[in-house]
């Protein structure tokens, strides 16, 4: 028969045997042996331990950095201790049978090695600068960056085991260690931390202002546009290009320039032509011959096949046709218009018919001068690239040139004709001669063009001979 089973006595007998099998000899110094539980009140002083085979013997413990190799052989004898091998350590006095393995810092937790492992100290791991430790359990931790408190100020700086504590600005609330905008508040907890939102300007704006403001802007723009138009029509320096479009007038007269000759109301359509008796003529040096082939500038219609269009609001450009022209000749009052001396203020006086007949060219030449074909011959004889130079030399201003170009649009030939006609109207009658045009063309080295104009006029008279009036 076996031993009687007594529940109260079985556990103390079985437990030491189980513990002896579970705990190996290498960890006997770390985990107390079951027999030590009964011998805690051992007479061994501090720094010594009971001999495992003889409880009456007290052996000295090994210093840190060493481990127990053999127990002391007897009382008063030294314990055999050995130094820990590399990669192992013991940090306290002990009677361990082997040293403990050194720990390693964990890179996945962003740990860094503060100090390496030595025989009497384990590896010391920590965090980098501006990081703190977030622990789980007693020893495990990971490193996290300290909060910089954006949208707030630092209340308590970052420490080894604690993140920065921030104080948020107005309009932000603290969530964890970050200041979050109150616009992102979606629960009642953050509503307690966020102040009441002030009403925006749009909510408090008067509804009448929304309607009145656009009206004020539109009225201001209209007023500015009207003032610009008035200034453009009033001041001379803005007139040249805008005067004829905005103000409805096409003729500009500058101060100091002769006024354009415009027929008075009720003027008889039949024109009385009066010529100066003393046209000016002076010898002119002839420059070298320069070819002036008009074919390079495009085909131009024959002067005799076209007539000048009426000038826009500027009065008649040319005299009437030869059939309606009355010359200053003696005759009965019912058939002709006699030229009589004008008032003293008049600058152009008609000469007696007998004296004019003695000094003026023949009637065909006069009619040719008064015919629009004469001006068209000059227009067709001068290259378009040199035309503005010609009218500038004749005394036409830049504003007048630009205005006539603007009025005639893309009709270059009609614009040139209008420039020449404007020069005729502004020039005294005794000076507006073909001889003057000839001198200007010679100064421009366009002698070939001058010959072409003479040929176009039929060769009845040379431009260098007796002056021929363009009136």
Curated annotation (Swiss-Prot):
Residues 340-360 are annotated as: N-SMase activation domain (NSD). The keyword Glycoprotein applies. Residues 372-457 form the Death domain. GO terms for molecular function: tumor necrosis factor binding; tumor necrosis factor receptor activity. Residues 30-210 are extracellular. TNFR-Cys repeats lie at residues 43-82, 83-125, 126-166, 167-195. Residues 1-29 form the signal peptide. Keywords: Apoptosis, Cell membrane, Disulfide bond, Glycoprotein, Golgi apparatus, Membrane, Receptor, Repeat, Signal, Transmembrane, Transmembrane helix. This is Tumor necrosis factor receptor superfamily member 1A. Disulfide bonds join 44-58, 59-72, 62-81, 84-99, 102-117, 105-125, 127-143, 146-158, 149-166, 168-179, 182-194, 185-190. Residues 234-471 are cytoplasmic. Its main location: membrane. The chain crosses the membrane at residues 211-233. Receptor for TNFSF2/TNF-alpha and homotrimeric TNFSF1/lymphotoxin-alpha. The adapter molecule FADD recruits caspase-8 to the activated receptor. The resulting death-inducing signaling complex (DISC) performs caspase-8 proteolytic activation which initiates the subsequent cascade of caspases (aspartate-specific cysteine proteases) mediating apoptosis. Glycans are attached at residues 54, 145, 151.
């Amino acid at each position: 028969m076996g031993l009687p089973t007594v529940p109260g006595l079985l556990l103390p007998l079985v437990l030491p045997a189980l513990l002896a099998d579970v705990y190996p000899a290498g960890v006997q110094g770390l985990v107390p042996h079951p027999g030590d539980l009964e011998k805690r009140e051992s007479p061994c002083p501090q720094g010594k331990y009971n001999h495992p085979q003889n409880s009456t013997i007290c052996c000295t413990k090994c210093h840190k950095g060493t481990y127990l190799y053999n127990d002391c052989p007897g009382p008063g004898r030294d314990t055999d201790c050995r130094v820990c091998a590399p990669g192992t350590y013991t940090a306290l006095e002990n009677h361990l049978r082997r040293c403990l393995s050194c720990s390693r810092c964990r890179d996945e937790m962003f740990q860094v090695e503060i100090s390496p492992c030595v025989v009497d100290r384990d590896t010391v791991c920590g965090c980098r600068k501006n990081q703190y430790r977030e622990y789980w359990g007693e020893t495990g931790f990971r490193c996290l960056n300290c909060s910089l408190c954006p949208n707030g100020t630092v209340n308590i700086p970052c420490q080894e085991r604690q993140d920065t504590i921030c104080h948020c600005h107005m309009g932000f609330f603290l969530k964890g260690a970050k200041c979050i905008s109150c616009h992102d508040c979606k629960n009642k907890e953050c509503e307690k931390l966020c102040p009441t939102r002030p009403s925006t300007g749009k909510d408090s704006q008067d509804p009448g202002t929304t309607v009145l403001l656009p009206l004020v802007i539109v009225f201001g723009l209209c007023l500015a546009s009207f003032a610009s138009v008035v200034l453009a029509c009033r001041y001379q320096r803005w007139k040249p290009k805008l005067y004829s479009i905005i103000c409805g007038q096409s003729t500009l007269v500058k101060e100091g320039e002769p006024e354009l000759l415009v027929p008075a109301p009720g003027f008889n359509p039949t024109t009385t032509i009066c010529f100066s008796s003393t046209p000016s003529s002076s010898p002119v040096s002839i420059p070298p011959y320069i070819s002036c082939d008009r074919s390079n500038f495009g085909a131009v219609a024959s002067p005799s096949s076209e007539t000048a269009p009426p000038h826009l609001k500027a009065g008649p450009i040319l005299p009437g046709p030869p059939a309606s022209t009355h010359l200053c000749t003696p005759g009965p009052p019912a058939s002709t218009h006699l030229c009589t001396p004008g008032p003293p203020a008049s600058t152009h006086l008609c000469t007696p018919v007998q004296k004019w007949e003695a000094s003026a060219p023949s009637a065909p030449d006069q009619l040719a001068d008064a015919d629009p074909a004469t001006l068209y011959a000059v227009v067709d004889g001068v290259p378009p690239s040199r035309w503005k130079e010609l009218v500038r030399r004749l005394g036409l201003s830049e504003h007048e040139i630009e205005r006539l170009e603007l009025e005639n649009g893309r009709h270059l030939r009609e614009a040139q004709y209008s420039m020449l006609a404007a020069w005729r109207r502004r020039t005294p009658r005794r000076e507006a001669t073909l001889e003057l045009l000839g001198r200007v063309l010679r100064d421009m080295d366009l002698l070939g063009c001058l010959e072409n104009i003479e040929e176009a006029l039929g060769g009845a008279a040379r431009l260098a001979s007796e002056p021929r009036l363009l009136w």
